[in-house]
């Protein structure tokens, strides 16, 4: 798939822009704080209905306005697909083929993107919530039912936590009813995640082995607050874990076990990647991103769109070459950069946009 055009209105520092893209490589060139990353953010937003930089939709709207529009024409194997997202004071409207979508899970997955940004290094060093977010975003693109199951789980979890906080003495029967719903949706979420990570690990191992010149074996482990030694009896194990945790939950007024507490661990040659070098961390993240591309291709039979936010300067020559090998293949890529110095080995057939103060000054 590839994005033919993008129209943005009242998005960040752009009052309005209408851009036609190259099916291969598109480069946004400009100094910092001019609006390069905002275009990548708009593309990401068009795909996933959310920003990778902020949790607040208000941050995306131009400071002089109270609404925004992001729309694009996506080219897939089945033909052209118009996409629209409109943020207004009354809420969000998403459309596919000009038809309003009632649920986000009906919209997300139409356009697949893989984002690689400098802050992705925090996947290894950051908090567990960042790694859960990574799973949720990537898995949600390729398996819409996951978003539905996760949403239902979070709804019951919020209901349970609110009940615990509001009552010093609880109705054990009512709590058991909530627990059964948590077990149902929680087990679905865990099984989705395990299946996703098993497939991602397979692709990432091959990529990391190649990048490390056959020296490092990468493994990915799902760390669950629910024991996973008998996956066929997961519901029973989950139920028992909630019973064991109930005294703790009543005291702390929240839920101590479940997929909202889970994490991922990365190992290089069986050693915790947390203790690896910065170079190993960059190789690991690059391996994951390249694996995402392969995984999305294998499931959707479409090539995702690659977004590279000022990452070339973060990579050494060998890692740049591995990334460039992917770019040179049949994948639409968007790159932001302050200089073309790091892009000497890119294909000649590219489109360069010069960005200045929220304006596209030139195209070549």
Curated annotation (Swiss-Prot):
Transmembrane segments: none
Gene Ontology, cellular component aspect: cytoplasm
GO biological process, one term: double-strand break repair
Molecular-function GO terms, alphabetical: ATP binding; single-stranded DNA binding
The entry's keywords: ATP-binding, Cytoplasm, DNA damage, DNA repair, DNA replication, DNA-binding, Nucleotide-binding, SOS response
Signal peptide per UniProt: none
InterPro entries per UniProt: DNA-binding_RecF, DNA-binding_RecF_CS, P-loop_NTPase, RecF/RecN/SMC_N, RecF_2
Binding site for ATP: 30-37
Domain of life: Bacteria
Entry's localization field: Cytoplasm
Family per record: Belongs to the RecF family.
Function (record text): The RecF protein is involved in DNA metabolism; it is required for DNA replication and normal SOS inducibility. RecF binds preferentially to single-stranded, linear DNA. It also seems to bind ATP.
NCBIfam families: recf (TIGR00611)
Protein name: DNA replication and repair protein RecF
